[in-house]
């Protein structure tokens, strides 16, 4: 069951034990990749990357798989940054759902599809 994180304090209750600091690290265009995200999560902060750093949906799927496989249940969650104006948005959303990604950032457009 997916937790309702809209309730005040719910985010901290759900993720707090896995975070050393309440921050998101590394969502940098053409810089952030799986290794940086994994390191951030293992250090206790949310590791992020823009989906635009992946050159294809297949590569995005590979990155999400690699990150998910590298992290344990006590590590901080990772957080792809979905670029809302990308042609591959629907396919990227399908990857996120298939891998049950816990957190998503949206940018460059309205987040309504998410």
Explain the meaning of each model-derived region:
Residues 1-114:
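Active-site entrance/lid segments in N-terminal catalytic domains of soluble metabolic enzymes
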């Amino acid at each position: 069951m997916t937790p309702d994180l809209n309730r005040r304090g719910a985010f901290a209750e759900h993720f707090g034990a896995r975070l050393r600091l309440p921050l998101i690290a590394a969502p940098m265009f053409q810089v952030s990749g799986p290794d940086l995200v994994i390191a951030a999560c293992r250090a206790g902060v949310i590791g992020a990357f823009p989906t635009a750093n992946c050159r294809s949906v297949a590569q995005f799927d590979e990155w999400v798989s690699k990150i998910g496989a590298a992290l344990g249940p006590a590590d901080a969650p990772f957080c792809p940054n979905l670029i809302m104006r990308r042609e591959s948005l629907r396919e990227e959303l399908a990857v996120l759902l298939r891998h049950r990604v816990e957190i998503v950032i949206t940018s460059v457009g309205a987040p309504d599809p998410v």
